[in-house]
Amino acid sequence: PGDEFLSSINLYGGSITQFVHSFKRLGWNCHFVDPSDPENFRRALTPKCKAIFIEVLANPGGIVLDLEAITAIAQDAGIPLIVDNTMATPYLCRPMDWGADLIVHSTTKFLSGHGTSMGGVLIESGKFDWAKDGKFPTITEPDPAYHGLTFYETFGDFGFTMKARTVALRDFGPAMSPANAFYTLTGIETLPLRMDRHVANAMKVAEFLDGHAAVDWVSYAGLKSSPYRQLAEKYMPKGAGSVFTFGL
């Protein structure tokens, strides 16, 4: 209780609701940051801040964040960078290549891909030093529920994963059913093919709308006119995803 974290304001609405309401009831406080200038994260840091959370490709606005710059700020602060990569998928963007410490996905969307199942995944890079500065005692100090076992000392580069699985999963129960796991794995088999098609279709539609007299604006990072085009080419060289917004 009392811990804080920073989050980009450009997020999926369900995440914002969770951070503002559900997490607050648990005593975790989120401070939202305008990510258009990465230095805004540095300016918002406090001694109680334990993480930075972002969507590298924001849902649904088609906004691309400067992943490398935000990673550097998190590293300077000694806190993990958590990236929601749902919209980009591992096929289009590899956040760990740019220094992300934890990645989360809603598998319900592109990974599953067929509307058959709901779920989520958590991936740990194994490179973050949880013992540094004593900021994360729940991972680095003995756990009485496991006879004094210290997760980071025992499991090393997958200590966070083991803590999440053996404690959070056990106590709160967010376990995927076998059927949902099967459908998700089946969907992942066609992820590259599907994402290539999604990107190609999205570009065609975005270009059409961008040139239509009745359309006021289109926010899609794949367009040449997008202010996020360079960031998209850097972090998502295979395409800027398939979710975007436009106004009339």
Feature annotation, model-predicted:
Residues 1-211, 219, 230:
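Conserved PLP-enzyme active-site core in the AAT-like
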Residues 217-248:
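Conserved PLP-binding catalytic core of the aspartate aminotransferase-like
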